[in-house]
Each structure stands twice: as C-alpha cells, then as structure tokens.
Amino acid sequence: MTNESFKSGFVSIIGRPNVGKSTFLNRVIGQKIAIMSDKPQTTRNKVQGVLTTGTSQTIFIDTPGIHKPKHKLGDFMMKVAQNTLKEVDLILFMINAEEGYGKGDEFIIEKLQTMSTPVFLIVNKIDKIHPDQLLLLIDEYRKRYPFKEIVPISALEGNNIETLLAQIEAYLPEGPQFYPSDQVTDHPERFIISELIREKVLHLTREEIPHSIAVAIESIKGQDNGSVHVAATIVVERDSQKGIVIGKKGSLLKEVGKRARADIEALLGSRVYLELWVKVQKDWRNKMSQLRDFGFKEDEY
C-alpha cells in the first residue's frame, strides 16, 4: 500500500439529542470516549474519535445535540455544532428510526441547506422498527434533502456498521495520517475522566440533576505502587442538588465513585484511587468564566 493513496478526513456526527451519536462513536472506536446517557444534550465538548485502518484515518467529531438554546451554555453548544459543520469533509446526519421525522430535524435540515459538505442520512435503531416502516421513513427524508447516501444501522447491535465505514472511506479525500495509529481521541485523559464521572452522576440521579452539573479534575497523580490517585469535584448549581448527588449517608456519591473508578481503571490500565467532592457554584451555566474553568474554551468555537 503506497502512502499516496492513503485517505484521511474529518467527519461530523449531528442529529437531535439522543439519536445514538455517542453509542455509534463508542461502537466504531471501541472505547468509551463520548459520554453516553439517555438525557438530551449530554455531549458537550467536541469529543473526537480517531479510527485508523491500513488505508485511511477518519476523525469523528461528536457535536452537541442541535437544539434551540435556552441559556449561555446552550448558545455555546449550538455555536460549536454549526461551526464544526463548516470544517469537515463529511456530515453524518443521524436520526432515531423509532421517533420519525420531527421539528428538530426540520431545524437541522434548514441548516444543512446552506452547506456544501456531502451529507449521509444514518437511520439508527433499525432493530426497533418493522422494515416497512423503515422504507416509509427513508422516503420521508429523501423528499426533504439530497442525501449522498442513506444507511440504516443499529449502533447498539453493530448492524451495518462495517458497510457504513466503507462508504465513509469512499468519500474521504486523499491525505496524511493526522494522528498515531494507536490514538483513539485527541482529548486529554483529564477530560475523558471528568466525562466518565459526569456520566455516572447523570445516570444515577435521573431527571433530578439534568445539566446543572460539571466535573472539575483537581489532580491526577501516579503513586509509587503503580496506582493512580484521581481527585475530582462535582459542581452543582443548588444546595438541594448537592444533597441529591451525595445521597443518603453518602450512598449515591459512593456508587458514582465505584462505577467511575471501574471505567477510569479500564482507560488508564492501572488501579485507581478516586476521591470525589461535591461543591455548589450558583448559576455556573450562565457565567462565562466558570464555563471556561470546566473546559468550554471560547477560542475553539
């Protein structure tokens, strides 16, 4: 294989909240790099997954769910999503087969009309509907936008993923290998660790603490015995939320720690001692300086 025919490019995954973008990314890359939760808007920064094969390198950008902003954090997420689309080689517009066409999709298709980037329609969760329904759904979308390819998949089950990856590679331009072969994301470990902790809090608190939570990593230190000490603070907006995150006699926080530790150990490949605190910072979502502390960098957007 001569290097001249090597292909590389950037692929953006967009769609309404909860269509399975993170599940797809994690299935393709084979590691838990995008936070997965069934609450809308759980992906906040541009998590990049890097897939390298003998013939190509695909850099996936997982944009926040496109939605009409409600506050500064929402504004921020919307801006990231739109700017990302201008810089990529291919856009994967993912929909949930069960939900069908909706207002949120109209909003996204409107944005796509102004772009020259090729767009694939990815119909996810096909294991949940009848094939006849699937064909009707595909027709519905085909009428509204000239998609280059339409690919039905199940990210969770892995159905049709290989076919999709081959089609993506066909659309990539020839180019260099941007990242080393063994690199799966360009986010530093500190960021991934904070996202893993955040994911556990979202899972365990359900609706009570939707997006009023950020995780700040205070320190990551290697110990003499080969283990790693991680200290992190979970930041909430109200005192009542602090009580929920800590739980009865600290039970919920303990469970967050237990689950997060298992994932962090898998990520780092060593034993981890995880220390967690909970802190209240009122209305952090509307304060830009605090957004910056939590890794939302304005200059990237």
Curated annotation (Swiss-Prot):
Its main location: cytoplasm. GTP binds at residues 15-22, 62-66, 124-127. Residues 124-127 are annotated as: G4. PROSITE patterns: G_ERA, KH_TYPE_2. Residues 62-65 are annotated as: G3. The keyword Transmembrane does not apply. Residues 7-174 form the Era-type G domain. The keyword Nucleotide-binding applies. Induction: Constitutively expressed, two-fold induced at the end of the exponential phase; this is under control of Spo0A, suggesting it may have a role in sporulation. Residues 205-282 form the KH type-2 domain. Residues 153-155 are annotated as: G5. Residues 15-22 are annotated as: G1. It is a peripheral membrane protein. GO terms for cellular component: cytosol; plasma membrane. GO terms for biological process: negative regulation of DNA-templated DNA replication initiation; positive regulation of cell division; ribosomal small subunit assembly. Estimated to be present at 3000 copies per cell. An essential GTPase that binds both GDP and GTP, with rapid nucleotide exchange. Plays a role in 16S rRNA processing and 30S ribosomal subunit biogenesis and possibly also in cell cycle regulation and energy metabolism. Binds both GDP and GTP. Complements an E.coli era disruption mutant. Monomer. This is GTPase Era. It comes from Bacillus subtilis (strain 168).
